[in-house]
Design a protein with these regions (language model features):
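Nudix hydrolase/Nudix homology domain
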Residues: 97-143
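Conserved beta-strand signature within the Rossmann-like core of class I S-adenosyl-L-methionine
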Residues: 288-296
Length: 341
C-alpha cells in the first residue's frame, strides 16, 4: 500500500489528527524498528478521546508499542487525519507503563531496506522521509521544538514529579535521581542546568543535608514559564533561578559554582561537546569544581552509551560515575563527572 502524505513543518490543529505513526531515532542517528507479531513495524496508534496528541499521544504510543521514550518530536507529513512524525529518544526503563518488545537499531537506509524486504515498502518510504527531516533539523528548531512540547507537558503536571518530567511518585523520584548526589562530597554551591520546576534543586539540597552537606542551590531553564513556576514553588530561592539556554548561558554576576549538573539532551547531539566545554569554562568553579553529566535514557546493557562513555568518546577525562547505591527499584542510568582544572 502506497502512502501519500503532504510534507509539513509545523503541528496540525488538534482536531485534524486522529492517527499517528512515528519513526524513532536514537541520539546517534540510528533508526529503531519494532519486531512485532506481524513483522517489522513502526510505533503507530489512534489519538484517544480527551488526549492532546502533541503531549499525550506522542508519549503514549511509542511507550505502549515500542517501549520507547521520546525527548524530541517533529512532524513531517500528513495524510488526511493521519500524522507522520519522528521522535528522538531511547528505549524506556522507567516507571511508566510500557512494552518491552524486541527492537532493531540500524541506519535509516538499512532500516528502510529491511522494511522493503519484509514487504513493507510503505513504511520504508516513511523512514526515508523521516530521515530527510531528521538530518536537516537545525539548532534553533531543536530548541523551539523542546519548548513547544516539554513546556506544555510540565506545566500541566499535577505533582512536583510531573512538573519535572518524571512519571513516578516521590519514592520513585528518589530512587531515580538520588544517585546524582554521589558526586557531591563537600558543601558548596549547586547549579541545575535545565531545572524545570526546581524539584531537583530542592531534592539535592535535602539529600545532601542527610549526609551533613550544606548546598546552596541555583537553577536555569530554557522555558521562562518553567522558571516562573520554579520561583513560585521555591520563593526562598527565586532570585537564584534564571531563564537561559544551556549551550551559552553565563551567570549574570560572573559567579562560578562548585557543582553544575547538565543533561546531555538539553542540546542537539552534535553540540554535546560544546555543552561540556562551555560549562567547564564558564560556570564550574576553577580548581576544584565538578561538572555532573547525566543521560537518563542511557542503558549500557542494550548498547545505549552511558554518560561516562559519552564523555570519554568526546575526549573528556571522566573522574567518576555514580553506582545507584542500594535503593530499591530498577538501577538508574549513572551520572558521570568531570573535574575542573
Amino acid at each position: 500500500m502506497a502512502i501519500r502524505f503532504t510534507p509539513i513543518r509545523s503541528d496540525p490543529p488538534a482536531d485534524q489528527v486522529r492517527t499517528i505513526t512515528l519513526v524513532p531515532f536514537l541520539p546517534d542517528g540510528r533508526c529503531v524498528l519494532v519486531q512485532g507479531q506481524a513483522g517489522l513495524a513502526l510505533p503507530s496508534g489512534e489519538v484517544r478521546d480527551g488526549e492532546d496528541y502533541l503531549i499525550d499521544t506522542v508519549l503514549r504510543v511509542p511507550l505502549e508499542t515500542a517501549g520507547f521514550r521520546y525527548q524530541h518530536f517533529r512532524p513531517f507529513g500528513l495524510d488526511g487525519d493521519h500524522l507522520y512524525g519522528w521522535i528522538e529518544g531511547a528505549p524506556y526503563t522507567g516507571w511508566r507503563p510500557h512494552a518491552e518488545p524486541e527492537l532493531t537499531a540500524a541506519s535509516a537506509e538499512d532500516a528502510a531496506a529491511r522494511l522493503r524486504d519484509a514487504g513493507r515498502p510503505d513504511l520504508a518510504a516513511v523512514v526515508r522521509a523521516a530521515a530527510r527531516s531528521h538530518r536537516t533539523l537545525d539548532d534553533q528548531t531543536y530548541y523551539a521544538d523542546s519548548l513547544r512540547t516539554l513546556e506544555r507537558a510540565y506545566l500541566r503536571g499535577r505533582t512536583p514529579q510531573d512538573g519535572s518530567g518524571f512519571g513516578g511518585d516521590e519514592h520513585a523520584w528518589r530512587q531515580a535521581r538520588h544517585h546524582i548526589t554521589e558526586g557531591m562530597t563537600t558543601a558548596g554551591t549547586f547549579l541545575d542546568v535545565g531545572c524545570a520546576n526546581g524539584l531537583l534543586m530542592e531534592s539535592v539540597v535535602a539529600w545532601c543535608a542527610e549526609r551533613g552537606l550544606r548546598l546552596e542551590p541555583f537553577g536555569i531553564d530554557l522555558a521562562s514559564s518553567l522558571v516562573e513556576l520554579a520561583r513560585r514553588r521555591l520563593p526562598q530561592w527565586a532570585d537564584r533561578i534564571w531563564a537561559g539556554n544551556a549551550i551559552d548561558w553565563t551567570p549574570p554576576d560572573g559567579r562560578r559554582f562548585d557543582y553544575v549538573h547538565v543533561l546531555l539532551d538539553c542540546v542537539p547531539t552534535h553540540r554535546r561537546g560544546d555543552l561540556i566545554r562551555h560549562h567547564l569554562a564558564g560556570t564550574v568553579s576553577e580548581g576544584g569544581g565538578r561538572l555532573l553529566v547525566s543521560d537518563y535514557s542511557a542503558d549500557s546493557a542494550r548498547g545505549w552509551p552511558t554518560a561516562a562513555q559519552t564523555l570519554r568518546a568526546l575526549g573528556f577525562a571522566c573522574a567518576g560515575e555514580s553506582t545507584g547505591g542500594s535503593l530499591p527499584g530498577p538501577p538508574p542510568a549513572p551520572t558521570a563527572w568531570v573535574d575542573s582544572c
